Amino acid sequence: MSSRVCPQRPVAKSSGDAKVLLIVSTYKPRAAVLAADVVNFLSIRGFQCHTIEYDGLNKESCARAGYMFAVSIGGDGTTLFAARCASPSGIPILAINLGRFGFIAPIEPRYWQQALSDYLAGGVRPAERALISCTVTRAGKEIASCLALNDVVLSSGRVARLTRAEVCFNDISFGVYEADGIILATPTGSTAYSAACGGPILDPDLDAFVLTPISALCLSNRPVVVPSSGVVRIKVLSMRHKETVLSVDGHELCTLQEEDQLLASRSSCSARLVFCTPHVFYHALCSKLAWSGSIFSRRGRRHDD
């Protein structure tokens, strides 16, 4: 399942050897002050805190095993970065939201002490979210690899230029896509760029990915939901402008050439996100995307008026 709940042991008070990783946004005005408060809160309880500053441009490196958990302080972008850093080592992530949406950063700043206390007491279990494992090959050699919690996007590097690519799933060709780009999104990422391009929103518990074309030239190229147990292969075809970009969770990974191939499948590791329950997910859909039903109910009028 994409959002499996993991067993949780009481963390309790540390003897001083336990380490906590803080990943702190440098472009959120309140982040530094809040981070200092979190460090003080944890230090009193015997934890050693190590901090990584995230400026939106960092290239992630895998956090070493040994951290009991990580605290992300920023928005969804900071949480995405934290997931790519912490997930290979199985480190749970508590994400405090200082951004606008907070789909995967569910802890509001005014509740951070209660959230940490509940987690340390063992009252909250992290849920596993699926990650995409992606490799890029050129002439049979791997030139890049990545993990993505939201999505991987193949797109033209220029405005108003089409990308041509053949899309296959488990070696079954879906045909050639001529579009502004192609998105492969996880259930977590289905609420982001894919949704903006007309893709469906997937429940986090679904073992599936969604392939969504961006402004496809052929109207029959529609979003397709595929099981995450398979392998998606995208081959870059000849194009006039000679420039196709691969982005991961909103950050450019590399520039692709003709005949380059992208292979994507579900990663063997998952993002362990604390407080990202199904209830929180659906509440976020209603509140963050302003789902409020009838326009009459929003105005406080009866449906039969």
Curated annotation (Swiss-Prot):
Keyword Transmembrane: no
Localization terms from the record: Cytoplasm
Tree of life domain: Bacteria
Top EC class of this enzyme: transferase
One of the protein's GO biological processes: NAD metabolic process
GO molecular function: ATP binding; metal ion binding; NAD binding; NAD+ kinase activity
One Pfam match: NAD_kinase_C
Active site positions: 76 (proton acceptor)
DNA-binding keyword on record: no
Residues annotated as binding NAD(+): 76-77, 150-151, 161, 180
Reported cofactor(s): a divalent metal cation
Keywords, ordered alphabetically: ATP-binding, Cytoplasm, Kinase, NAD, NADP, Nucleotide-binding, Transferase
GO cellular component, one term: cytoplasm
Catalytic reactions on record: NAD(+) + ATP = ADP + NADP(+) + H(+)
InterPro entries the UniProt entry points to: ATP-NAD_kinase_N, ATP-NAD_kinase_PpnK-typ_C, NAD/diacylglycerol_kinase_sf, NADK
SUPFAM superfamilies xref list: NAD kinase/diacylglycerol kinase-like
EC number(s) from the headed UniProt entry: 2.7.1.23
UniProt function note: Involved in the regulation of the intracellular balance of NAD and NADP, and is a key enzyme in the biosynthesis of NADP. Catalyzes specifically the phosphorylation on 2'-hydroxyl of the adenosine moiety of NAD to yield NADP.
Protein family per UniProt: Belongs to the NAD kinase family.
Name of the molecule in the record: NAD kinase
